[in-house]
Amino acid sequence: MSKINKVVLAYSGGLDTSVIVKWLQDTYDCEVVTFTADIGQGEEVEPARAKAEAMGVKEIYIEDLREEFVRDYVFPMFRANAIYEGEYLLGTSIARPLIAKRLVEIAEETGADAISHGATGKGNDQVRFELGAYALAPGIQVIAPWREWDLNSREKLMAYCEERNIPVDFSNKKKKSPYSMDANLLHISYEGGNLEDPWWEAEEDMWRWSVSPEAAPDQATYITLGFEKGDIVSIDGETLSPADVLTKLNKLGGDNGIGRLDIVENRYVGMKSRGCYETPGGTIMLPAHRAIESLTLDRESAHLKDSVMPKYAELLYNGYWWSPERLALQKLIDATQEHVNGEVRLKLYKGSVTVVGRRSDNDSLFDASIATFEDDAGAYDQKDAEGFIKLNALRLRIAAKTGRKLS
């Protein structure tokens, strides 16, 4: 690694990244630029400014990226109906490409030689940040302190802070959650602590965004979501921005006990990891989007989308958002969304999301006159089915005549 004069750090203002500021200054004798993104994590980001200033940081970036995050990352992902390993809605994965993008942009703006992040050497986030950075700025240098230093425990980090007068408040350390948590506008995740035993049931007081399904209201909540080109643009007739859509759906879902998930997933780095997630808004969005597609997409387009979805989800999970293959898949997916317009009505009740209606005034491919079980007035000639069946059975009949066994 060549001489580092200036580094842009993804800075949260918490213990780990506050230690990293001073560690970078001490280890590399360099100037540190901090970048703090508000992507809906639910915490005040302004205090990060005072902490950075107290450590001698001269260039401080604090940005509200909530709208960009939902519009340019969350919504495109949901157009793909992306789910990793059948369950995970990719809430952590989707936040990393935007942060990586801004890190390298700020590095270019400030003339920095490198970027840095607080992801550990065991997790997926180090891969996601760095693949994104190299895709966008191939010459950038990356410093990952967790892969270099020996501060491998919370106690060592706290001691480092006290030795160097790093401004971190330890007054509430006894109240600190036993879990490693990460949040953005799409979800909040919980890892570590007792969750490292996959048989251990998470305590009820761990969950922060939702009530338990048992404690949810006894009366169902009905909502109507409006779609334009595959994206939600309104809730119950009220036009909302992308970030406001997700914020409102999170509240509706959380109030009705929706969006909890407890899984063991396969990390890209090779190990299995248990994680608990709350994704109330996303858990509503996914079936709603599939419902409006069921009405407006033709069969083969829908099936093609379903066939590429697992690859899309895997690319995103593994950190390849900026790869040519993900970008190519996105163009394919977006092309299918031109006529995904209309409304979906949903019932939210004690942890469940049920589609109860869907309609599209101009783009519906559902023709009741053909699909009806009643008299269709000649709209569909049932005799045509005989030839269709015989043609499709031809290869099966030929194979059967050879005496091939079917099992």
Curated annotation (Swiss-Prot):
Q: What reaction does this catalyse?
A: L-citrulline + L-aspartate + ATP = 2-(N(omega)-L-arginino)succinate + AMP + diphosphate + H(+)
Which annotated residues bind L-aspartate? 120, 124-125
Question: Its Enzyme Commission number?
Answer: 6.3.4.5
Q: Which residues bind L-citrulline?
A: 88, 93, 124, 128, 180, 189, 265, 277
Q: Where does this chain mainly localize?
A: cytoplasm
Protein's UniProt keywords contain Amino-acid biosynthesis: yes
Where on this chain does ATP bind?
10-18, 37, 118
Q: Which GO terms describe its biological process?
A: argininosuccinate metabolic process; L-arginine biosynthetic process; urea cycle
Lineage top rank: taxon: Bacteria
Pathway entry:
Amino-acid biosynthesis; L-arginine biosynthesis; L-arginine from L-ornithine and carbamoyl phosphate: step 2/3
Q: Name one Pfam family in it.
A: Arginosuc_synth
**Keywords, comma-separated and alphabetical:** Amino-acid biosynthesis, Arginine biosynthesis, ATP-binding, Cytoplasm, Ligase, Nucleotide-binding
Please tell me which top-level EC class this enzyme sits in. Answer: ligase
- Keyword check for ATP-binding, yes or no: yes
Q: Where in the cell is it found?
A: Cytoplasm
A GO molecular function for this record?
argininosuccinate synthase activity
Q: Where does the sequence pass through the membrane? A: none
Q: Which HAMAP family match?
A: Arg_succ_synth_type1
Subunit structure, briefly? Homotetramer.
Q: What is this protein called?
A: Argininosuccinate synthase
Q: What gene name is listed for this protein?
A: argG
